[in-house]
A protein has these predicted regions:
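Short, structured surface patches at the beginning of a domain
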Residues: 1-127
Length: 127
């Protein structure tokens, strides 16, 4: 049976070109892995609550096996809320994959959060 995927595309600044580029990248990745794309969410700005509810409902009803997005920032929410979304999807049989960050799991997310944390002191930036 062919695996099913949902693509989650988001442009923070509302750029249609960025959305199309992301959609093409994700579609190519799904095709290369022989996944059937069952739904594409395309959003600008902050990820909407309705999209998150749709994802949860689809996961609960086992309508897809993979959620694919460009990177972790696609969720556009605080780390604890993002972790809860990933946890819920995994518990319902969905593997969360990103092109830039790999597979997301509840175990890998804390490291991902720490790697993105930056400290600013005066005009100098520390990673």
């Amino acid at each position: 049976m062919q695996k099913r995927a949902v693509l989650l595309c988001r442009s923070e600044n509302g750029s249609q070109a960025e959305l199309m580029e992301t959609m093409n990248l994700l579609s190519s990745y799904a095709k290369d892995n022989e996944w059937k794309v069952v739904k594409i969410f395309s959003e600008t700005g902050k990820l909407g609550d309705l999209t998150l509810w749709d994802l949860r409902l689809m996961a609960k009803h086992k309508e897809f096996e993979y959620l694919l997005m460009k990177d972790f920032e696609t969720f556009s929410m605080p780390p604890d809320e993002s972790m809860e979304e990933v946890r819920y999807l995994i518990e319902n049989g969905v593997e969360v994959r990103t092109l830039n960050d790999g597979n997301l799991t509840c175990e890998s997310l804390p490291t991902l959060f720490r790697n993105r944390f930056k400290i600013f002191v005066g005009k100098r930036k520390y990673n």
